[in-house]
Structure formats: structure tokens, C-alpha cells
């Protein structure tokens, strides 16, 4: 049974939302999980990826590669990592695009906005844990 009636489970609508998403929506969709150390430190599970974060690829052909994020290509939903390149036939090098779902964040670039985001997400998690679930027996 569907839990939220405002969210469509239609393939057609999901694809349309994916391909017509604005840059701000794509930023949220391009989130990645935090490493275990960062997760325990900040009490946050995932964050949107940004330039200068350090990541580790955990699945795909480039598994176990680590590096700094050089660019977030929102139009293609990929990120570029500094040490992941391929040499083309003409001798030039090109970046390999990696899906954000295939990486985990190992080191964050923190500025005042990112710190505020972490604090805000941590506060909502703490508030949810403080709530007591009450179940009513209907007989």
C-alpha cells in the first residue's frame, strides 16, 4: 500500500520529473551517503555532493578509487573525480563520469552554509528520536 498519496508511483511521471528537474532539485537528487566515521560524527546519513568533497567509489568499474570531486555535472547527474580519467585515441585525457549513488563521502568541504545544513539535519534527527510512538489498539 502506498504511504504517501502525494507521491506518484507512475513510471511516466517519475521519468518526467527526473529529466525536467531544476538545478536545485538535481542537487538534492545527487546526494551521497557519508562514510561510517562521518555518519557517527555528524549524525547525518547523506548529503548533496559538492565540488572539493573527497569521495570513494564503492561500486562499478572504478570501485575503490578515491579522490576529490572536480565537478558536479548536474545536467548528466554525474560527478567527476580528479584521479579518474581515460586517455582518448587522440592522446587527450577525459574525465570519467561517476554516479553519486556509487560513491560515499569520506571528507567534507565545510563552510558556514554546509555547517548550518549539518546542524539543521542533525537537529531534525534528534527531534525524531525524541518522539515516542503511541500505538492505539482498536478492538
UniProtKB/Swiss-Prot annotation:
SMART domains: KOW. Keywords: Ribonucleoprotein, Ribosomal protein. One of its GO terms (biological process) is ribosomal large subunit biogenesis. InterPro entries: KOW, Rib_uL2_dom2, Ribosomal_uL24_CS, Ribosomal_uL24_euk/arc, Ribosomal_uL24_KOW, Translation_prot_SH3-like_sf. Belongs to the universal ribosomal protein uL24 family. It holds the Pfam family Ribosomal_L26. GO terms for molecular function: RNA binding; structural constituent of ribosome. It comes from the Eukaryota. Residues 1-25 are annotated as: Disordered. This is Large ribosomal subunit protein uL24.
Amino acid at each position: 500500500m502506498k504511504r504517501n498519496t502525494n507521491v506518484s508511483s507512475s513510471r511516466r511521471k517519475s521519468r518526467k520529473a527526473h529529466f525536467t528537474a531544476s538545478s536545485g532539485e538535481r542537487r538534492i537528487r545527487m546526494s551521497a551517503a557519508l562514510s561510517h566515521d562521518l555518519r557517527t560524527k555528524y549524525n547525518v546519513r547523506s548529503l548533496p555532493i559538492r565540488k572539493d568533497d573527497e569521495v570513494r567509489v564503492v561500486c562499478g568499474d572504478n570501485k575503490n578509487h578515491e579522490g576529490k570531486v572536480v565537478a558536479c555535472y548536474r545536467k548528466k547527474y554525474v560527478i567527476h573525480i580528479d584521479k579518474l580519467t581515460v586517455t582518448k585515441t587522440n592522446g587527450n585525457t577525459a574525465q570519467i563520469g561517476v554516479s553519486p549513488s556509487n560513491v560515499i563521502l569520506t571528507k567534507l568541504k565545510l563552510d558556514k552554509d554546509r555547517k548550518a545544513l549539518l546542524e539543521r539535519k542533525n537537529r531534525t534527527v534528534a527531534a525524531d528520536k525524541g518522539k515516542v510512538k503511541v500505538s492505539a489498539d482498536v478492538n
